[in-house]
């Protein structure tokens, strides 16, 4: 039984009240936060007030949904009405949104309880949470290691049982890579399946919101609650949303799974490769047919992404100038100086780096050579995936080339940090769904993630394969000792 299902069972049978469950998670947060720093804001009073409302409904004999009374954490780049939303940036340190994001509105309507807002790399730009203006989030399995990024706070909170599940956002791997590093399940849905309204934009053609959860079932429940068309998001897809839990079947007879050859070569940690090989044997034993295939342009994903994403970021982040909201620098003698001082003092080094890259790529003399060419390569990557899905139902590869690295190890070398997302970035460029599921541990006791990639809107297929694998392996049952 999943964490959400077990908590729901306890509530319905009146074994525990919503207040008791919420208080237990808040106590856990208080216990481990000095070590982890998963949260930027803990909404203690609000959470207990929400729990009290759920208890009133239960006392009145009301039937409740699966998410009613379930404590969840929300990445701090999702707008929450009346609750500070910082994007882990000095620029928005005191910003309190006047509106609610669609996904958090849906969770509220489902009766879920928000216990807090989680840490991230500033404006979701990074792979370790070390770019947060408010300190990095430690890995629950080893606090000297990073939790991944940019949704490191959400991944660590789920792994450390500070919440039942969490929401993150994924632009180039920001849900899946931290999920792998922290040993939890993380899904980046098909582009447009989940509304982006109220998500503070980084790269709008790549950003997507998704669940991080302790089990595949929990992730399926959470996706079902947040997916669906939204007129407030022009890129939102008008498609029916199935009950994803119906796809959770234990055997894989007839399933064709393709191993992407380009993802098991140089640069992959040997223990990650071994875990992948063991996972492939397990999937075969469950009835799947394995096919080795090539996505020749997979390797071009990284350079393509680091032209397209910064280009979109340079446009999206132009709004932070000290005029309407957020941080405003003091001591400027005129408007131009105020703009310059605000942006110089308000943004961190990595955000400035990406704005500069993007502005350069979009400039008149370089637009064709960089941005336009990157968009053409993006199309070729999509075509590679389309050809692969003519042969198989699901593609498979490691989520990340390595397990979690030490804090401070890669901060001086941005390129080595960018390589953490080598396996995840092409999935965003193609707009496909990708899921990371735990598949073992290395010799240092650090989790390893297995990435499953599906065709457009094939989340149910990913859940099916991940669930079958999860049910025959012990990885999801292991928890960090904190």
UniProtKB/Swiss-Prot annotation:
GO terms for biological process: translation. Pfam families: Amidase. The keyword Protein biosynthesis applies. It is an enzyme of class 6 (ligase). PANTHER family: GLUTAMYL-TRNA(GLN) AMIDOTRANSFERASE SUBUNIT A, TRANSAMIDASE. It comes from Thermosynechococcus vestitus (strain NIES-2133 / IAM M-273 / BP-1). Keywords: ATP-binding, Ligase, Nucleotide-binding, Protein biosynthesis. GO terms for cellular component: glutamyl-tRNA(Gln) amidotransferase complex. This is Glutamyl-tRNA(Gln) amidotransferase subunit A. It comes from the Bacteria. Allows the formation of correctly charged Gln-tRNA(Gln) through the transamidation of misacylated Glu-tRNA(Gln) in organisms which lack glutaminyl-tRNA synthetase. The reaction takes place in the presence of glutamine and ATP through an activated gamma-phospho-Glu-tRNA(Gln). Belongs to the amidase family. GatA subfamily.
